[in-house]
């Protein structure tokens, strides 16, 4: 028997005529809040393009949209007829516009859920308890949380939890153009950084297109990049996420120095030079490379030998080179 959404598609049903997003924003006197890093995207051609970048959305799929705001991208998602649409919006001021969209979408037999919550604290497994549906994560992210949210989701992906209990959960997200370029930056690239390596350990990030800042209201000072992150079927490491993140963060803490400088800050000063030299030799990585010249595989080998070092020297895991040194008081 055909699923409800499939029947809707076959019958040619569409969303009923509605006011434009620009008209709704004006009608409900909605203004973007700077403290929430809000920027409204009014052009439906662009919201359609974002959703198209997510790839095929089947009638049995579930879409989780982050920060729908007045509902521009939401409309574009509804036109693709997923079985379920789950919205997570922190700002309750958008309740009336989102409720209007929900009512207009009711003839399409799409399960439409709205949650007013902070996505950084939102328990996805509680609201999506089973893994029978493929999940698409889509969002025009507030700049203030975009990097933190991506790191959180990469952590979930590494642990196969939350939205990533299935390996086919893709992320299609907006970032400041510079951040988007960093996520996708190749080895040796000017923008290569910690975020590049962490993203590329567990996903294949693809820069889909750039949205000029003038397309948003209010206009941000930067352009916006749309990135699709496709989980790798075979992750490049089985090491714990937090360990890889710690090693990569230290390596890139001195981006323009030899990579041994940042990596060395993982180790206590007493025998730092000697131990670091041995670890680089075991990892078969040249210690005079700059961090941005390291491949993902080289970073992971450095993480692996560090992990092995902790087996014999577990106290090193607690070492923090930024901690104040003990000073003898006379």
Swiss-Prot record:
Annotated CDD domains: AdoMet_MTases (cd02440)
One Pfam family, short name: RrnaAD
Record GO terms (molecular function): mitochondrial transcription factor activity; RNA binding; rRNA (adenine-N6,N6-)-dimethyltransferase activity
GO terms for biological process, alphabetical: mitochondrial transcription; regulation of translation; rRNA methylation; transcription initiation at mitochondrial promoter
PROSITE patterns reported for this sequence: RRNA_A_DIMETH (PS01131), SAM_RNA_A_N6_MT (PS51689)
Listed EC numbers: 2.1.1.-
Annotated localization: Mitochondrion
Uppermost EC category: transferase
GO cellular component: mitochondrial matrix; mitochondrion
Predominant subcellular localization, coarse grouping: mitochondrion
Protein task: Probable S-adenosyl-L-methionine-dependent methyltransferase which specifically dimethylates mitochondrial 12S rRNA at the conserved stem loop. In contrast to mtTFB2, it does not have a critical role in either transcription or regulation of the copy number of mitochondrial DNA.
NCBIfam families: ksgA (TIGR00755)
Additional detail: Encoded on a bicistronic transcript that code for two proteins mtTFB1 and CG42630.
Family indicated by similarity: Belongs to the class I-like SAM-binding methyltransferase superfamily. rRNA adenine N(6)-methyltransferase family. KsgA subfamily.
Protein name: Dimethyladenosine transferase 1, mitochondrial
Organism: Drosophila melanogaster
Gene: mtTFB1
């Amino acid at each position: 028997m055909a699923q409800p959404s499939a029947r809707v598609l076959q019958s040619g049903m569409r969303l009923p005529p509605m006011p434009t997003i620009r008209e709704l924003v004006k009608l409900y006197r909605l203004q973007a809040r700077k403290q929430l890093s809000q920027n409204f995207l009014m052009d439906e051609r662009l919201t359609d393009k974002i959703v198209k970048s997510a790839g095929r959305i089947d009638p049995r799929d579930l879409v989780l949209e982050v920060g729908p705001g007045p509902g521009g991208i939401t409309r574009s998602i509804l036109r693709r007829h997923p079985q379920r649409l789950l919205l997570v919006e922190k700002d309750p001021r958008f309740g009336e516009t989102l409720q209007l969209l929900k009512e207009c979408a009711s003839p399409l037999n799409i399960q439409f859920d709205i949650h007013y919550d902070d996505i950084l604290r939102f328990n996805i497994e509680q609201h999506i308890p089973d893994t029978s549906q493929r999940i698409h994560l889509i969002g025009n992210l507030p700049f203030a949380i975009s990097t933190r949210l991506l790191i959180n989701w990469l952590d979930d992906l590494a642990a196969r939890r939350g939205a990533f209990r299935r390996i086919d959960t893709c992320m299609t997200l907006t970032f400041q153009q510079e951040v988007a370029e960093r996520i996708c930056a190749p080895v040796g690239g000017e923008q290569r950084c910690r975020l590049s390596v962490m993203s590329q350990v567990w996903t294949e990030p693809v820069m889909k297109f750039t949205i000029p800042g003038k397309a948003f209201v209010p206009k941000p000072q930067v352009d916006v990049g749309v990135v699709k992150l496709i989980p790798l079927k075979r992750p490049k490491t089985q090491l714990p996420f937090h360990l890889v993140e710690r090693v990569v963060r230290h390596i890139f803490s001195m981006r323009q120095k030899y990579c041994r400088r940042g990596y060395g800050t993982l180790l206590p000063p007493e025998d730092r030079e000697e131990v670091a030299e041995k670890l680089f030799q075991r990892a078969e990585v040249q210690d005079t490379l700059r961090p941005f010249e390291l491949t993902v595989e080289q970073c992971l080998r450095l993480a692996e030998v560090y992990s092995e070092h902790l087996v014999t020297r577990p106290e090193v895991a607690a070492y923090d080179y930024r901690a104040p040194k003990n000073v003898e008081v006379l």
